[in-house]
């Protein structure tokens, strides 16, 4: 077999490999989101403790038996699901599955019917005070404010809207120590409400040492 045939077969093999492994990677791509956005878009937001883990209840899926400690938000359908105390996720990391550690407490903000890498899940002890306050009620007070992902200097210099806060996924100060909240502003036409990043003490400290 000559060199061209070898190269042809190699090319076909590489195409097949990328086609096979490329699909799960595409399926797992998700836009970065601020914790406040996760709260707003979630079907349920709970604080839970992971009790057990099983890979045999449902083929291709990992099922976690959990104890729901607090429910911060849930649709009626999500409440019915949570009564069973079970959350499932794809068994394979390449199919967007996640791993929760047994015995640990997490805040989880998820969409029905499954938990995956695009969901919000964070160990409670690793959360900042601002994040804890946001999920326990702070974010619910800012339903009229939207966090908008912003990439590059051109975006941040662009037009600002009264109901949004621009956010860089690399901005740890806004992510960990602030929330997009309504704020009263005095104008020539009277008092209006605009959304802005809440200037907590921890946020100001972070901004002074970015």
UniProtKB/Swiss-Prot annotation:
Keywords: Developmental protein, Differentiation, Disulfide bond, Metal-binding, Metalloenzyme inhibitor, Metalloprotease inhibitor, Oogenesis, Protease inhibitor, Secreted, Signal, Zinc. Disulfide bonds join 28-96, 30-118, 145-195, 150-155, 165-180. Disruption phenotype: Adult flies display wings inflated with lymph, suffer from a bloated gut and progressive dissolution of internal tissues, have reduced fertility, show impaired fast phototactic responses, and die prematurely. Flies display wings with fluid filled blisters approximately 22 hours after eclosion resulting from failure of dorsal and ventral cuticular wing surfaces to bond following normal migration of the epithelial cells from the wing. Female flies are sub-viable, semi-sterile and grow smaller ovaries. GO terms for biological process: basement membrane organization; cell adhesion; delamination; imaginal disc-derived wing expansion; negative regulation of membrane protein ectodomain proteolysis; oogenesis; phototaxis; tracheal outgrowth, open tracheal system. Zn(2+) binds at residue 28. Expressed in heads of female and male adult flies. Expressed at the time of eclosion in unopened wings of adult flies. Strongly expressed at the tip of ovarian germarium region 1 where germline stem cells (GSCs) and cystoblasts reside and in region 2 of the germarium. Residues 1-27 form the signal peptide. One of its GO terms (molecular function) is zinc ion binding. Residues 28-145 form the NTR domain. Residues 28-31, 93-94 are annotated as: Involved in metalloproteinase-binding. GO terms for cellular component: dendrite; extracellular matrix; extracellular space. It is found in: Secreted. Metalloproteinase inhibitor that acts on both matrix metalloproteinases Mmp1 and Mmp2 in vitro. Complexes with metalloproteinases and irreversibly inactivates them by binding to their catalytic zinc cofactor. Required for wing maturation which is the final step in morphogenesis of the adult fly. Involved in the negative regulation of developmental tissue invasion for imaginal disk eversion during metamorphosis by inhibiting Mmp-mediated basement membrane (BM) degradation. Required for oogenesis and for the long-term maintainance of germarial structure and shape in the adult ovaries. Belongs to the protease inhibitor I35 (TIMP) family. PANTHER family: METALLOPROTEASE INHIBITOR (PTHR11844), TISSUE INHIBITOR OF METALLOPROTEINASE (PTHR11844:SF33). This is Tissue inhibitor of metalloproteinase. It comes from Drosophila melanogaster. The gene is Timp.
